[in-house]
Curated annotation (Swiss-Prot):
Residues 937-1000 form the Tudor domain. CDD domains: SF2_C_RHA. This is Probable ATP-dependent RNA helicase spindle-E. It catalyses: ATP + H2O = ADP + phosphate + H(+). Its EC number is 3.6.4.13. Residues 81-91 have a biased composition (Acidic residues). The gene is spn-E. Residues 76-98 are annotated as: Disordered.
Length: 1433
């Protein structure tokens, strides 16, 4: 180690960069310091496209047979002769022609076509080429009429000949297929759905038999051809927009070419596009003797278009030459675009005298379209333009943003004419290349950049990369101008770079996107292995990408790991899950979500979630650096679940209810704006939900009929949905970091000086010399932007610290009503809002006075005391001797529970105060004290202390608020100070306190104190939102109704006592655990620290006099009181001559995450900023167990160093939940034991390994989970039973490839799954010490184990897990651990400096006596004591 350190500082030696481990480490990281095979990042070898050559050669031979069966004319010999007219006749037998005379008599056929369309000029040439060639390529510019007219030309010719024809035309988008079909019907005056119709997804117009011209999406035709395995169902197949080269189109080209040569030689194929690469497509469909003919049609431009490149604009002074090799926009790039804007404006001003058009008119039709690669660049460009235009007031502009996430209102702004005298500048992404046409655009500024999504098939991580746009993209962008007048295009690159460096076409989707659906289609095609089919693509993927995709499909259960029982690296037999997945237009993991939803009888919910995950921008996006109030609405929809997917489900349910209530359009739009919902996306999602329901029905996935089994209630559904999500998106698992650090909770409280971390945030960079107590109100006002009222918080300072602490008040006023917004765990909603506020803007300006002025200000107004130049602000003097809080020397207290909110909050009156309370009550109810009736409602204000009727007597109360107005008579909500309960009372049940009474009792602390149950918290299995279940509260109420109770005080923190309630038959806390209404829990650091202090004081009590005990207790209580916010009036702003910047607010609970996958160990992780988990806080800071987050998808940065989790769900804080889910849903796993085989300590999950070499099949996706709770053989048996039942749900998969289990069998299986899952999650698991080793990622040879029974053999998607039997603990080991434990207790009362001790039970080092004492109080150590049989003397 020392030599390594010296080498680091030896600058004569070469410095080597290394990769730091960033993944999920649980336990001692020192165990990983030795380098091993597993400690290095995985780099899988990439295999290119050499495999293609042999397969393509065979396909060419098949294509050459196409010549033998066709009449070939005007064939082109070489690529250079594509336009030649050489003819070659090859007379062969013609196909039989089917007459369709009756059909043409049935419908009206007007054969007069629109001659004004440019395509009409090539009509005869097009038809001649189609008659004489199997494949024709038609290149026609946008707007020439090819999409609507060419199919009609074919239909007209068939009509003339009275021949049968059946034409199908593909469109890449649904809306295009529908609108074009309707347009053709309108043009021909056909009833929609007769001669011409459309099909999108499963939705097809009714009269199928009469349809002769079908417009459909690419996927519809592809699925039909895979099912039919022939083209002969159609006479003509027209593939439109083939240049887009998405995966469906590329795979469709494979299928069409293969079937055309194989069994459909007489079918005609027409390829159409505005920007088609004619050479590539001609080569793809070429035979040995000819190439398909190319017919070109153009429409001619009405107004001229001039293009300029950066190096051609000599009059503009460029500050620097761009680094064109690396795509991107620097500060100078934005400035250069603004220079062009100024040049455009000056040019139009000077042209006024030379043109008939005025300057104002020129601005109206001279809108500027600036193409930028993304939303961040749009915001940056807008900022630059705004700042420059402020210096040029003569140029008045309107900036409009245009991107896919904009609201409908913003979309309308793009098309609206600019205000009089304004020039419209549209900042857009590539959405305006083809989807949007704005007529008044005359100028385009093109940065020639785009963002393209690439997916690493080995990791399944996606990355949005900034790249140079293709020339095709740039030409499409240029085509946006010149609609109303001549146009100009300014490309922000040099002409040489554009011509020589930029690519002609973009990268096809098949080379950069996941291949799962293409591989599944290749399997369904049944014409060879996936690699043999995909090798035939126009741009075949790398073999390693196919291999990785096969591995991913095996992981999700779409493919078996074997082919006919033998492992295949590049192939696997199609499972019934894979067949179902191939029928859904979804990512395979969303399809898996639906399948598991069917298994666990939550089909409707998962269909909605899957539909919502396919729709982009369900929520609207606000502008940068603006706290988007509507963002908080995401949390309302998530309803405390911590799940983006649950939020989607709830949004849809509300929308559906509104639709059923027939809400007016205006009301729906108002609701959508209020809740930040994109109504257009919601409607699109609704259509997808309907389609997915149809697709589920088509593969026999149906919900169980109501009444056939017990349905999930809302509480159960909140857990089962998360179980399904964990199963669907395995292995996108992430674990919160730092929880296992023994020092975690101590540093947590130290950072906020003992405040409650669940209610406290803090600012930094506040210098104490600025006398912060003067500005508490101003600091509170900072939170108004997130709608937190100033009265709901206290602002405090620590002497000498630069931190400002903001503690939010518990919502006592609403504790009997449900909150509008729920957040997970114990943390207050306001903390989430505060942290979200910082994420939008980290620096907060605050106006203050300089120190000398501030000192004069407080002295003049006698605020506090100034001593030797130091200000001491006013403070509350605590009369701690009057507090009713339990003494530090009191262990047990007897008394009454006065009011119960829940097991986590109730109020207790000590028996010792009974006489004084009775005396107070007698005073309050004397005639003289009750004489002050409330005559005027205005006299009752919030916070006023008065007397209010409680039962038959009046008691002290404080006014919370005016509650209701009933018949003009106000009612007031009050809280009884000495009992804790609340009531809503009319004025006649209130009395004002006389002056003398107020003087005597106004400052008297409450005659009760707040309590909560210690060492337990609500069970996540039986409660939601960390609330105590009703059954638990009812148990506490029944105990309290028995009269006097005995409380054992565990600790006192922030004036709240953590207690154990003793009953005749035990302790209530334990009984709640036994009934699964609660679970055992650690107390937090402050509670354990106080408990340790109380134990030591109580042990020493016999040696301390009563008077000394009182003095010590007063000192204890005084020290326990936190600083109070005095809420001083701030100085006037005109006296505040300085501005400082606070940083924050921060929360000590902010968490980071680590990937649990091996491939993600070396990467940092963030959560998508629009997720409900974007503010990820430690919801249960006292709990040291890991809590898991599951992501629907994961993207990575271009440098692959950082991952972003999207569509996240926070899993329930059930101990061991992550390990149990991995065991339940992984393809296979090995659970490993400690060296003595007495307990399971970790599990290795993944796709499995080669039994001969022990090398993993898919090392990147192997996952290690170190166990922190006990997992037993019984748990593995339960999991195996559940895996068997999931497989059984699809047993007897028949020839129709549909699950054929009957309803009765399904009900039996579902009830078994329900029972097993409840058993698995409901166990109270004891804690175990952490284990980490260097061999965790090594698959072990377990051939000595008897293999488990496999009911479905190698046809099981979820094979049975095997595991070693556990041994009993060795007696000598137990004795050693007991001796170690006794030694720790012996050191507990040591007063000197302690040498480092090791707790061998928990594998933790203890550096001090204080640390040792607190460790002995942890749940982990107490559980370990029980496990080793140690009993404290």
């Amino acid at each position: 180690m020392d030599s390594d350190l010296m080498d680091f500082f030896d600058f004569s030696k070469q410095f080597k960069r290394g990769t730091a481990l960033k993944g999920c480490i649980t336990g001692d990281p020192n165990a990983l310091t030795t380098e091993s095979r597993d400690s290095k990042p995985i780099k899988r070898e990439k295999i290119g496209t050499d495999y293609v050559n042999e397969i393509v050669e065979k396909e060419k031979q098949l294509m050459n047979k196409l010549v033998d069966g066709q009449s070939v004319a005007k064939r082109n010999r070489t690529l250079d002769e594509l336009d030649s007219d050489d003819e070659e006749e090859n007379m062969q037998e013609q196909p039989s022609v089917r007459s369709d005379e009756a059909y043409y008599e049935k419908y009206r056929f007007d054969l007069n076509r629109n001659k004004n369309l440019p395509i009409y000029a090539q009509r005869e040439q097009i038809m001649k080429a189609i008659r004489e060639n199997p494949v024709v390529i038609l290149k026609g510019e946008t707007g020439c009429g090819k999409t609507t007219q060419v199919p009609q030309y074919i239909l007209d010719e068939a009509c003339k000949r009275r021949e049968f024809c059946n034409i199908v035309v593909t469109q890449p988008r649904r809306i295009a297929a529908i609108s074009i079909a309707n347009r053709v019907c309108q043009e021909r005056q056909w009833q929609p759905g007769t001669v011409c119709s459309y099909q999108v997804g499963l939705h097809r117009q009714s009269n199928v038999e009469d349809t002769r011209l079908l417009y459909c999406t690419t996927g519809v035709l592809l699925n039909n051809l895979i099912r039919l395995k022939t083209l002969t169902h159609y006479t003509h197949i027209v593939l439109d927009e083939v240049h887009e080269r998405d995966q469906d189109m590329d795979f469709l080209l494979i299928v069409v070419r293969r079937l055309l040569a194989l069994n459909s030689r007489h079918v005609k194929v027409i390829l159409m596009s505005a920007t088609i690469d004619t050479r590539e497509f001609s080569k793809y469909f070429a035979t040995s003797s000819a190439f398909p003919p190319v017919v070109t049609a153009s429409h001619g431009r009405k107004y001229p278009l001039v293009k300029y490149y950066r190096d051609q604009l000599k009059n503009i002074h460029w500050k620097d030459e761009p680094q064109e090799r690396a795509p991107g926009i620097g500060p100078e790039g934005y400035a250069d675009a603004i220079k062009i804007l100024l040049v455009i404006d000056n040019m139009e001003r000077k042209a006024v005298g030379q043109s008939l058009q005025s300057y104002e008119e020129a601005k109206r039709t001279g809108s500027v379209l600036i193409f930028l690669p993304g939303i961040n660049e749009i915001d940056t460009m807008a900022d630059h333009i705004t700042s420059v235009m402020e210096e040029n007031p003569t140029m008045i502009i309107t900036i409009v943003r245009c991107h896919s996430l904009m609201s409908p209102d913003s979309q309308e702004e793009v098309f609206q004419p600019p205000l009089p005298g304004h020039r419209k500048i549209i900042l857009t992404t590539n959405i305006a290349e083809s989807s949007i046409t704005v007529p008044d655009v005359s100028y385009v500024i093109d940065f020639c950049l785009t963002k393209v999504l690439h997916t690493d098939t080995a990791t399944n991580y996606s990355c949005l990369r900034l790249e140079w746009a293709s020339k095709v993209n740039c030409r499409q962008r240029a085509g946006r101008v010149g609609r109303l007048r001549s146009g100009r295009v300014y490309r922000m690159v040099s002409k040489a770079f554009y011509l020589e460096e930029m690519k002609e076409f973009g990268i096809p989707e098949m080379l950069r996107s996941p291949l799962q659906n293409s591989v599944l289609k290749a399997k369904e095609l049944e014409m060879g292995r996936p690699s043999e089919i995909l090798a035939l693509a126009m741009s075949p993927p790398n073999l390693s990408d196919i291999q990785n995709t096969v591995l991913l499909l095996k992981e999700v259960g779409a493919l078996y790991t074997t082919v006919d029982g033998v492992y295949e690296e590049l192939d696997g037999d199609l499972t019934y899950w894979g067949t179902i997945m191939s029928r859904f237009p979804l990512d395979v993991r969303l399809s898996r979500l639906i399948i598991l939803g069917y298994v666990f009888n939550c089909l409707e919910e998962v269909i909605v979630i899957a539909a919502g995950m396919t729709v982009r921008s369900l929520y609207l996006t606000g502008k940068r650096r603006q706290v988007n109030d509507a963002f908080w609405m995401h949390y309302i929809f998530a309803d405390g679940s911590g799940s983006d997917m649950v939020a989607i489900w709830r949004v849809y349910r509300i929308y559906l209810n509104m639709c059923q209530d027939r809400m007016l359009k205006e009301s729906a739009e108002q609701w959508a704006r209020r809740f930040n919902v994109n109504l257009r996306s919601l409607k699109e999602m609704h259509l997808m939900v309907q389609e997915l329901r149809q697709r589920c029905a088509s593969v026999n996935l149906q919900p169980l009929p109501y009444g056939t089994c017990q349905m999930w209630d809302d509480r159960e559904k909140s857990i089962i949905l998360k179980v399904i999500i964990a199963g669907a998106f395995y292995p996108n698992y992430f674990m919160r970091s730092n929880k296992s650090n023994a020092d975690y909770d101590r540093s947590l409280f130290q950072s906020i000086c003992g405040n409650d971390p669940c209610r406290t945030v803090f600012f930094t960079h506040y210098e104490p010399r600025y006398m912060g107590e003067l500005y508490t109100r101003r600091i509170k006002e900072l939170f108004l932007e997130v709608k937190i009222p100033p009265e709901n918080m206290d602002v405090t300072f620590l002497h000498g610290s630069e931190k400002v602490f903001v503690t939010f008040k518990s919502d006592d006023e609403d504790m009997d009503t449900a909150k509008v917004v729920q957040v997970p765990g114990r943390v207050m909603t306001e903390v989430y809002k505060a942290v979200r506020m910082r994420l939008e803007n980290q620096n907060r300006p605050l106006r203050v006075m300089d120190q000398n002025s501030a000192l004069r200000y407080v002295q003049d107004r006698k605020i506090g005391v100034v001593t030797e130049g130091t200000w001491f602000p006013p403070s509350n003097q605590w009369n701690v001797e009057l507090l009713t809080l339990p003494s530090v020397f009191a262990k047990n207290i007897t008394g009454l529970v006065t009011y119960i909110v829940s097991c986590g909050k109730f109020y207790f009156q000590p028996r010792a105060l009974a006489e004084s309370i009775a005396s107070m009550s007698e005073i309050f109810n004397g005639p003289q004290q009750l004489s002050c009736h409330v005559r005027n409602a205005s006299a009752v204000t919030k916070g006023l202390q008065l007397l209010a009727k409680r039962g038959h007597l009046f008691q002290r109360a404080v006014v919370l608020r005016i509650e209701t107005q009933t018949n003009g008579h106000p009612r007031f909500r009050v809280r009884f100070i000495d009992y804790g309960d609340m009531a809503v009372l009319p004025m006649d049940q209130l009395r004002l306190m006389p002056h003398e009474l107020k003087r005597d009792f106004d400052q008297l602390p409450p005659r009760m104190f707040e309590c909560r149950l210690a060492l337990v918290q609500p069970s996540m299995v039986t409660s939601s939102y960390n609330r105590w279940p009703k059954a638990a509260n009812d148990m506490l109420i029944s105990v309290a109704q028995c009269g006097r109770l005995e409380l054992e005080v565990y600790s006192l923190v922030n004036n709240v006592a953590a207690v154990l309630i003793h009953m005749r038959d035990g302790v209530l806390n334990d009984r709640l655990v036994e009934r699964q209404l609660a679970r055992r829990a650690d107390e937090d650091y402050m509670s354990r620290k106080d408990h340790d202090l109380r134990i030591r004081k109580q042990e020493a009590k016999r040696n301390i006099s009563v008077a000394e005990q009182e003095r010590i207790n007063e000192e204890y209580l005084r020290f326990a009181q936190l600083p109070k916010d005095m809420d001083l009036e701030p100085p006037p702003l005109d006296k505040c001559n300085l501005s400082i910047r606070l940083r924050g607010p921060f929360s000590p609970l902010e968490s980071s995450m680590n990937s649990m996958l091996r491939i993600g160990m070396y990467k940092s992780v963030t959560i998508d900023k629009d997720s409900v988990n974007a503010v990820l806080l430690d919801t249960d800071p006292q709990d040291r167990h890991d809590q898991m987050v599951v992501a629907a998808s994961v993207t990575e940065t271009d440098n692959t160093e950082r991952l972003t989790a999207r569509g996240t769900t926070l899993m329930p804080n059930i101990h061991g939940f992550g390990a149990l889910m991995a065991m339940l849903f992984c393809p296979t796993m090995q659970i490993k034991c400690n060296k003595d085989r007495t307990k399971y300590v970790c599990l290795l999950a993944g796709l499995g390994f080669d039994p001969e070499t022990l090398e993993p099949y898919f090392a990147e996706h192997d996952m290690v989970i170190n166990l922190d709770v006990t997992i037993l053989r019984d748990d593995i048996r339960i999991i195996n039973q559940m895996r068997y039942n999931i497989d059984s749900m699809f047993y007897n998969f028949d020839a129709n490839e549909m699950p054929s289990v009957g309803t009765e069998d399904r009900v039996v299986i579902f009830n078994q799954l329900r029972s097993l899952l409840t058993r698995l999650l409901g166990k109270d698991r004891s804690f175990i010490e952490r284990h980490v080793s260097n061999s965790e990622y090594l698959w072990e040879d377990m051939s000595d184990l008897e293999p488990p029974s496999e009911p479905y053999g190698k046809r099981a998607i979820f094979p049975m897990h095997s595991s070693y039997d556990l041994e009993n603990d060795n007696l000598s080991n137990l004795l050693e651990l007991q001796a170690n434990c006794k030694q720790l207790y012996d050191w507990r009362n040591f007063e000197g400096n302690l040498q480092t001790q090791v707790c061998r039970l928990c594998n933790e080092s203890l550096e001090s006596v204080a640390e040792l004492r607190l460790h002995l109080l942890t749940q982990l150590h107490r559980d370990r004591e029980k496990q080793v049989g140690y009993k404290q003397q």
